[in-house]
């Protein structure tokens, strides 16, 4: 019987053929926690009586949400993870010394391997499917179970095939493609499904765009997002010191898909998701008619804080200034990305344009710090969620967009089209 990539990954892990809808218990290749979710997992771990991690090298803690600590409470919370990491001599512990947002840092470190089953106590763990792995977010107690046993159970998800065809026009990126998918199927259109992204348009999408695609699978309710390994993936992996040998899986022709969605990307304009759902997508042409003044622009996050995003923003910002009434905050996703941006002269461009460049952190995205919105303020953001109060006051508004739209809007002081600057 024909299988999808996701079914093949689970079959390989349990060592017999499995299909969508079946319940399986499987080993976990990588377990990921952060400074917010791991303390709960640690408490459950200790309450169980466990003394040792089942697979220490397959457990990573990435301190990224409130690091450096924003207040005493977050400092005490971070201390729980630090103490645990030091007690267990954790190999994959990433703090200020080597910091970054977990879903950018893990692939950068070679800790995501094609064919893996990965779980993380963070909903955007689905990002790692861009490297041909099954990767999904779970709760902190689920994480604790994997810490103790090295395993977890799943219902093998059915798959929705998303086929992108055509060549994307200028300033169309993975962010626009996934916002269009969510616009079409809604925030629950892929509930507990694997979103498999494919089609001839994939050859035009670099790894950064692919990470954006898979990152926001959860915003359509998806259990995971996944992309088969190709030459672009292999080129990315060649520069990484992978922790294990990759296993490449490909869907069989004739595999069973619950739904097939076909999108001609050549017809897409940049997409902006209006408040208060990622499914409220509008084309930039529609958005321009609203002539919306913007108070803040944020470029960063695990969705769009990678080097290509910073390069895109820098090309638009070079020689220009952020609008008088608008703030621009730029947050590189990892220290390595920040260093590369500095070496390329991007930091000079940002500062000269009037931007504030912060350390890597999830802070602004979740309304934690480093970019919180006040009452009634509007923000164009390259993040992944725009729910009520997501980035600050409940009356504030977040408009999700790609990095080019964000940079152009910072200059104009309102939602702007980067193609006409």
UniProtKB/Swiss-Prot annotation:
EC number assigned by the record: 4.2.1.33
Pfam families according to UniProt: Aconitase (PF00330)
Cofactor binding, per record: Binds 1 [4Fe-4S] cluster per subunit.
PROSITE patterns cross-referenced by the UniProt entry: ACONITASE_1 (PS00450), ACONITASE_2 (PS01244)
UniProt keyword list: 4Fe-4S, Amino-acid biosynthesis, Branched-chain amino acid biosynthesis, Iron, Iron-sulfur, Leucine biosynthesis, Lyase, Metal-binding
Enzyme category, top tier: lyase
Domain of life where this protein originates: Bacteria
Gene3D superfamilies the UniProt entry points to: Aconitase, domain 3
HAMAP family for the chain: LeuC_type2 (MF_01027)
Family per similarity comment: Belongs to the aconitase/IPM isomerase family. LeuC type 2 subfamily.
Protein's UniProt name: 3-isopropylmalate dehydratase large subunit
Species, as recorded: Campylobacter fetus subsp. fetus (strain 82-40)
């Amino acid at each position: 019987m024909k299988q999808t990539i996701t079914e093949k990954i689970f079959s390989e892990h349990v060592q017999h053929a499995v299909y969508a809808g079946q319940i399986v218990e499987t080993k976990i290749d990588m377990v990921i926690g952060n400074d917010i979710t791991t303390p709960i997992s640690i408490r459950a771990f200790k309450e169980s009586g466990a003394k040792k991690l089942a697979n220490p090298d397959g457990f990573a803690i990435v301190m990224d949400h409130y690091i450096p600590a924003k207040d005493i409470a977050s400092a005490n919370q971070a201390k729980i993870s630090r103490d645990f990491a030091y007690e267990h001599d954790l190999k994959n512990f990433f703090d200020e010394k080597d910091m970054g947002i977990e879903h950018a840092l893990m692939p950068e470190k070679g800790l995501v391997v094609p064919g893996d089953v990965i779980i993380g106590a963070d909903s955007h763990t689905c990002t790692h499917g861009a490297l041909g792995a099954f990767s999904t977010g779970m709760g902190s107690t689920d994480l604790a179970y994997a810490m103790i046993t090295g395993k977890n159970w799943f219902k093998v998800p059915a798959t929705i095939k998303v086929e992108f065809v055509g060549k994307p026009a200028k300033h169309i990126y993975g962010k626009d493609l996934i916002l269009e998918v969510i616009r079409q199927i809604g925030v629950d259109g892929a509930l507990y499904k694997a979103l498999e992204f494919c089609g001839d348009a994939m050859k035009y999408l670099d790894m950064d765009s692919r990470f954006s695609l898979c990152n926001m699978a959860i915003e359509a309710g998806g259990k995971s997002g996944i992309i088969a390994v190709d030459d672009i993936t292999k080129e990315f992996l060649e520069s990484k010191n992978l922790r294990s040998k990759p296993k490449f899986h490909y869907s069989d022709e004739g595999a069973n898909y619950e739904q097939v969605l076909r999108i001609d990307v050549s017809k897409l304009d940049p997409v902006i998701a209006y408040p208060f759902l990622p499914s409220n997508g509008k084309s930039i042409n529609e958005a321009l008619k609203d002539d919306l003044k913007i108070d803040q622009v944020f470029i960063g996050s695990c969705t769009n804080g990678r080097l290509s995003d910073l390069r895109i923003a820098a090309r638009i910002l070079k020689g220009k200034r952020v609008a008088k009434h608008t703030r621009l905050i730029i947050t590189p996703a990892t220290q390595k990305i920040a260093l590369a941006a500095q070496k390329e002269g991007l930091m000079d461009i940002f500062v000269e344009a009037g931007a504030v460049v912060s350390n890597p952190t999830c802070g602004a995205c979740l309304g934690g710090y480093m970019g919180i919105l006040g009452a009634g303020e509007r923000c164009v953001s390259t993040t992944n969620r725009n729910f009520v109060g997501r980035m600050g006051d409940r009356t504030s508004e977040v408009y999700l967009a790609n990095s080019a739209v964000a940079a152009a809007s910072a200059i104009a002081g309102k939602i702007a089209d980067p193609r006409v600057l």
